[in-house]
Amino acid sequence: MISINKIHFGDCLKNFPKIPNKSIDLIFLDPPYNLQLNKELTRPNHSVVKGVDQEWDKFDNFNSYDQFSKEYLSECKRVLKDDGGLWVIGSYHNIFRIGKILQ
């Protein structure tokens, strides 16, 4: 069991199984953005986006990224109180995929 009335940092897929159903008021997520770039990507203002080349942000394809997202979002749904809040940050590379899964 995880202690209550505290802010917990960590991997939700490792920590959430220790948390009872419908017991969390707020979840703040900063998930991987899936930013492995095979070519140059620019923002609308033409500045270059730097990709991420670290293991925690590597996925085989969009399906594996979506599956990973479904796993942690399912756990969020399980532990959030009925009137709880979910705050997910992202970039325009991933936030719409996460939004679709949330719907």
Please state what every model-predicted region is.
Residues 1-103:
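S-adenosyl-L-methionine-dependent nucleic acid methyltransferase catalytic domains
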